[in-house]
A protein has these predicted regions:
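Outer-membrane beta-barrel translocator/channel fold
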Residues: 1-23, 32, 36-38, 52-57, ...
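Extracellular loop and loop/strand-boundary signature of outer-membrane beta-barrel proteins
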Residues: 9-17, 67-74, 116-122, 159-165, ...
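Hydrophobic, lipid-facing positions within transmembrane beta-strands of outer-membrane proteins
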Residues: 13-15, 23-27, 45, 70, ...
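Short sequence motifs at beta-strands and strand-loop junctions characteristic
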Residues: 17-23, 39, 74-80, 124-129, ...
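Membrane-embedded beta-barrel scaffold of Gram-negative outer-membrane proteins
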Residues: 20-80, 87
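Outer-membrane beta-barrel proteins
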Residues: 29-37, 45, 86-92, 140-142, ...
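Gram-negative outer-membrane beta-barrel transporters
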Residues: 42-53, 72-156, 187, 198
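C-terminal beta-signal and adjacent terminal beta-strands/loops
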Residues: 98, 151-158, 166-168, 177-223
Length: 223
């Protein structure tokens, strides 16, 4: 069902939206292993493949000069995809744990509403075929260090998959370091983040450039 914002949010809502109807098929696999001792303490592998048929799919779509968006229904969309996730945790030294996680998604989401349309069987706007992430985290006692890499592949910013509408892939790296503290029954955490570590120029949405390298310091308390 469309949300209240989808229907009525100023300049973006569309009160004529219809609810989505979806037929879904999927098959999955999951394996998890844990050990109380040893160098490799935990690892897992998850896979999921799916095929969805969606009628009246609700999407956000740019209008005008793309500085304003609206919600609309796409008649029929066929989605085929696979999600893969793997992780492992190593314990090379006492109190030191290193965790790595990989995630990959392939998704084909094509408009199959009307064979007469110029965008028939084209990928719908802003849905990449390929995306993924990699995360490495090291923890030692009250310290933690985290690195993450996010990748989003090529997409199209309009319904027609033509060169003019092509949007370049983008990727970014983030890093953070944190320290936890305890006093009696109270706890605190201080964390420093460096986002977009290599100061990449990229747009998640056309004409909306994302910040270059930026920093955030967070201090939190639990009572």
């Amino acid at each position: 069902m469309p949300t209240f914002n989808d229907l009525y949010y100023a300049d973006m809502g569309n009160s004529q939206l219809r609810p989505e109807y979806t037929t879904q098929y999927n098959i999955g696999f999951a394996y998890d292993s844990r050990r109380s001792r040893g160098f490799l303490t935990e690892w897992s592998l998850h896979a999921d493949a799916y095929r969805n048929f969606v009628r009246d799919k609700i999407v956000a779509y740019p209008k005008g000069a793309q500085f304003r968006w609206t919600m609309l229904n796409l008649g029929r969309v066929r989605i085929t995809g696979i999600d893969l996730t793997g992780s492992l945790t190593l314990n090379p030294l006492r109190d030191l744990y290193i965790t790595g996680k990989l995630q990959y998604t392939y998704q084909e989401a094509i408009d199959v509403t009307n064979p007469a349309d110029t965008y028939y069987r084209d990928q719908i706007p802003y849905i990449p075929w390929h995306s993924g992430s990699a995360i490495v985290q090291a923890t030692w006692r009250s310290w933690s260090l985290n690195y993450s890499f996010i990748y989003t592949g090529e997409r199209y910013n309009q319904q027609e998959n033509i060169v003019y509408n092509h949007t370049q892939p983008w990727y970014t790296s983030d890093i953070s370091i944190a320290r936890s503290f305890r006093w009696s029954r109270y706890s605190a955490k201080v964390q420093l983040e460096v986002n977009n570590l290599f100061s990449q120029d990229y747009d998640v949405i056309l004409n909306y450039p994302m910040p270059k390298r930026n920093y955030r310091l967070t201090l939190s308390f639990e009572l």
